[in-house]
Amino acid sequence: MTKGRVTQIMGPVVDVKFDNGHLPAIYNALKISHKPSSASEVAIELTLEVAIHLGDNTVRTVAMSSTDGLVRGLEVEDTGAAISVPVGDVTLGRVFNVLGEKIDLDAPIDAGARRDPIHRQAPKFENLSTQAEILETGIKVVDLLAPYIKGGKIGLFGGAGVGKTVLIQELINNIAQEHGGISVFAGVGERTREGNDLYHEMTDSGVIKKTAMVFGQMNEPPGARQRVALTGLTMAEYFRDEQGQDVLFFIDNIFRFTQAGSEVSALLGRMPSAVGYQPTLATEMGQLQERITSTSVGSVTSIQAIYVPADDYTDPAPATTFAHLDATTNLERKLSEMGIYPAVDPLASTSRALSPEIVGEEHYAIARQVQQTLQRYKELQDIIAILGMDELSDEDKLVVQRARRVQFFLSQNFHVAEQFTGQKGSYVPVKETVKGFKEILEGKYDHLPEDAFRLVGRIEEVIENAKRMGVEV
């Protein structure tokens, strides 16, 4: 007998008591199917996931959808296995929820399709791949100063409204189209509108045919938001392990995964730790991140947007994520206020790949020179604010002049923002990026006005802008 009854309901957390000595294992999926017997009742189809054994044949579970209409005494059935989701080619071009149920308007998924459990072990050490190859994004500031690694983990950090989602959409646009391989997108606790926009953009561009999408958005209960990243990851792992593909895995937003965990943590009876987060924060993050990796068979390159609460990088949620990443792209509010987009902080963003062995001597030297110039400009800003430009030495004046040109040249227009800006987006190959910054630092364009460098792609566009401004080039 694998049936039990609901004994207690605390929002998204439900206690279930089983009789006859049966006890479902941790992570097992339990199902509640209730047909209404009167007009005042509602039909209930609900999946619960076992989180804790309380003793006395009772388990504490987390609901994967709304618990509205649930009452004590309802019958619950143990499925005998963890939540499993469809994997393989049937997922491409489709949109799913946390349980692997289709939420688009297309035909139902074939009942015979392979399904894999969302909980599994990370790959073994001996199977991991260690090669480093650069992934070109076409975004100058990223490719020059904090390049991404194929098969690596990349984090886009930023507070509210500085452009994380736009950046991740541009990366999907640039990389998914250039890369031509398979992509998986997991929308974790973000706006449904953004997911809808993304789906339609991908449909228009044709990328959707090679993409699987899973969503557990802001309006979903915390159980769904906590597990939806694992649903997407399970789909990506199949393409990596069974088909040997190089998969792109996008997550927007990994902070909401942590946030969902903290919402249910107190209800599950755990003592909160720093800033009210769950005490198991590092473990949960590790279990997810260690599975996102590249093996000798195939690779998963993951790009994760990470919300930084109140712009505080020492908050436990972003701080715990930092440790797992190969490259970080930090978005800075001050830059977005100056109208420099993407608002990537060139001094705070880091990458393991920025070394002469991986990017080459010239690229490395130019990147370091750009950072030194911007760092010196940052140091001089206090002097300029108090005494003005006239008090600087000629050498420092030149540094400031070039630094401002470099700062503006790090900005560019995005394809995904064309409908808002009316400007065409630009994709800049790494070689062109390095060439442009090299020429600026050599002083080749000192005579051109600063504004000519704003929101352009290649260095040739700067010259065209200057001509339009009536400057002798």
UniProtKB/Swiss-Prot annotation:
Its UniProt entry gives the catalysed reaction(s) as: ATP + H2O + 4 H(+)(in) = ADP + phosphate + 5 H(+)(out)
Q: Where in the cell is it found?
A: Cell membrane
Q: What EC number(s) does this enzyme carry?
A: 7.1.2.2
Q: Which terms does the record give in the GO molecular function aspect?
A: ATP binding; ATP hydrolysis activity; proton-transporting ATP synthase activity, rotational mechanism
Q: Name one Pfam family in it.
A: ATP-synt_VA_C
Query: Key word ATP-binding present in the record?
Result: yes
Name any GO cellular component annotation. Answer: plasma membrane
For this protein, the record's CDD domains field holds: ATP-synt_F1_beta_C, ATP-synt_F1_beta_N, F1-ATPase_beta_CD
Q: How does it assemble?
A: F-type ATPases have 2 components, CF(1) - the catalytic core - and CF(0) - the membrane proton channel. CF(1) has five subunits: alpha(3), beta(3), gamma(1), delta(1), epsilon(1). CF(0) has three main subunits: a(1), b(2) and c(9-12). The alpha and beta chains form an alternating ring which encloses part of the gamma chain. CF(1) is attached to CF(0) by a central stalk formed by the gamma and epsilon chains, while a peripheral stalk is formed by the delta and b chains.
Explain the purpose of this protein.
Answer: Produces ATP from ADP in the presence of a proton gradient across the membrane. The catalytic sites are hosted primarily by the beta subunits.
What is the designated name of this protein? ATP synthase subunit beta
